[in-house]
């Protein structure tokens, strides 16, 4: 039996394949552009906030703006990526009862000025005030210890995070050992890759910024 496709069918298949490829290319370009816009907007907002905080703390507007720009860009990209995951769950019907406002609030709560930005700035200002009292070698030891203590924003962004689905909740009893609350459907969580311990994203990120190890088993998150 001859299974050779007619020229018309072959042309139709080629056209469909071309349309699919072009559609994916356009979607990729749009996604990249949107991510860039979010990052730029977050960097600008963070830079303004950081500059104001830097002036108030008397350790430099430029340094505060630089720290704020980095933190703002990271936060904006995290919001965009998490929002995509949220809408995917919305379309698949596996989203929990939490609203979009609650969802975004989890990302913003304590992530920009209160934690990452202000904690870094205050520690920096504290050690700058005492810098004249120590030798060069002691300075290197102090700053090396502070740098190694917690994770950077880039390292945090590389750790896996996901939204707790109703199926995951049914499959396992999960609670956050940092805030001592159960992890509910629709909440954003982060799982540490080496030990697989899971926590609320906001809770564990606050911890990792200061410590860089698992709160339960104390295993280092990075090598």
From Swiss-Prot:
It is found in: Membrane. Induction: Up-regulated by chitin. Its main location: membrane. GO terms for molecular function: zinc ion binding. It is a multi-pass membrane protein. The chain crosses the membrane at residues 25-45, 60-80, 93-113. A zinc finger (RING-type) spans 176-218. It holds the Pfam family zf-RING_2. InterPro entries: Znf_RING, Znf_RING/FYVE/PHD. SMART domains: RING. The keyword Nuclease does not apply. Belongs to the RING-type zinc finger family. NIP subfamily. May be involved in the early steps of the plant defense signaling pathway. Does not display E3 catalytic activity. This is NEP1-interacting protein-like 2. The lineage of its organism: Eukaryota, Viridiplantae, Streptophyta, Embryophyta, Tracheophyta.
